[in-house]
Swiss-Prot record:
Gene Ontology biological-process entries: detection of chemical stimulus involved in sensory perception
Record's keyword terms, sorted: Membrane, Transmembrane, Transmembrane helix
A Pfam match: 7TM_GPCR_Sra
Family per similarity comment: Belongs to the nematode receptor-like protein sra family.
Predominant localisation class: membrane
Entry GO terms, CC: membrane
Name of this protein: Serpentine receptor class alpha-32
Transmembrane segments: 30-50, 63-83, 120-140, 152-172, 199-219, 249-269, 289-309
Protein species of origin: Caenorhabditis elegans
GO molecular function: G protein-coupled receptor activity; olfactory receptor activity
Length: 338
């Protein structure tokens, strides 16, 4: 977890001219309008994906429940982020000549800091819940159909508790007097301060989730090759393989897009030591990739639903052709004895 040392939040002297340029820059205003449009698009795609998940039973009830929760929490995060940035945009117009009012203080942003931190952790925690559900399915394959809906709800609740507990734990010291920021998204963003971004905890959670995804994919890929003469067990194994691979790929791609933000922050923090302009708030915004991740998730779900559905159709068509061939063979054999 982050080391909130006393010198982590030193007040950085910034000229009024620099603040005016930062807060009224066209790049900042264009970004807010652009990201709001991205988040609206993500909302519409998520609604469509949720309808697909509820109408087509291609995943178990627990996985379906957690995938829907992932879509919902992604859009909750987007709503929180949109409110924060749009509020900042409003101030950049309303107080363009008041350099004190145009900035945000740590005290007025504290609730938003905590909420946004919790929701970002929840975005990763729900992926961990999906991993736990897949582990349960693998370990108890013959009984995975027992209480799948309840299992999904329990894992969902645990993910919420974990993320909000971690988010609140990282803000136990409360607001930091004297600190100002361009929006309520980060506790300090005039220059990069990695001690105030929760990146360490965020990166650890993402890395653990990605490692579990790779493990699940490796196991299910090798497990499908094992011969099983129980037709029902073999069918369940194939169905679980398709759904688990789809969910793992979805989670990995989502985490990859999200991790770009963490990597960029570390890189820009080092580069800004020699060139401070590489650490200013307007540049940092463009590297926040979680909104793109929430845009990607419903698209991925739609693709995987189509993929699994097509594979099922091919399997059914193959089985039907074999059945007709066998019927024709025995009909001809019967006729030959007449």
């Amino acid at each position: 977890m982050e080391d909130y040392a006393e010198n982590s939040f030193n007040v950085i002297p910034i000229s009024m001219e620099y603040i005016r340029d930062l807060r009224t820059a066209t790049s900042f205003r264009v970004y807010v309008i652009y990201i709001d449009l991205v988040l609206i698009l993500a909302l519409f795609l998520s609604i469509h994906a949720i309808r697909e998940l509820t109408s087509k039973q291609l995943f178990s009830k627990s996985i379906t429940h957690l995938l829907i929760a992932s879509l919902v929490y992604g859009n909750v995060h987007n709503a929180s982020y949109t409110i924060i940035e749009t509020w900042s945009l409003y101030r950049s117009f309303a107080y363009s000549d008041n350099m004190t009012a145009i900035m945000f203080t740590s005290e007025e942003c504290f609730v938003q800091h905590v909420l946004n931190s919790c929701v970002r952790f929840l975005f990763i925690a729900i992926e961990l819940a999906l991993n736990v559900d897949r582990i349960i399915v693998i370990l108890f394959r013959k009984h995975f159909h027992c209480y799948p809906g309840v299992r999904g709800e329990i894992l969902n609740i645990l993910a919420v508790i974990l993320s909000f507990a971690l988010g609140c734990l990282l803000h136990l010291k409360g607001p930091h007097p004297g600190i100002v920021t361009t929006s309520c998204f980060r506790e300090t963003d005039i220059t990069i301060n990695l001690c105030s971004t929760n990146l360490t905890s965020y990166t650890i959670l993402s890395a653990c989730c990605a490692a579990l995804d790779f493990l699940m994919m490796w196991y299910t890929w090798n497990d499908r090759k094992k011969i099983n003469y129980d037709l029902n067990s073999q069918y369940l194994k194939v169905e679980q393989h398709h759904s688990l691979m789809a969910v793992s790929l979805n989670s990995l791609l989502q985490l990859f897009v999200t991790s770009i933000y963490a990597i960029s922050m570390f890189v820009l923090a080092n580069m800004s030591m020699t060139n401070p302009e590489l650490g200013n708030a307007n540049l940092l915004r463009w590297f926040y990739t979680t909104p793109y991740s929430t845009l990607l998730v419903p698209i991925q779900i739609k693709v995987f639903i189509q993929w699994i559905g097509n594979r099922r159709k091919r399997r059914i068509n193959t089985a039907t052709r074999v059945s007709l061939t066998q019927d024709g063979y025995f009909t001809k054999l019967s006729d030959s004895w007449k």
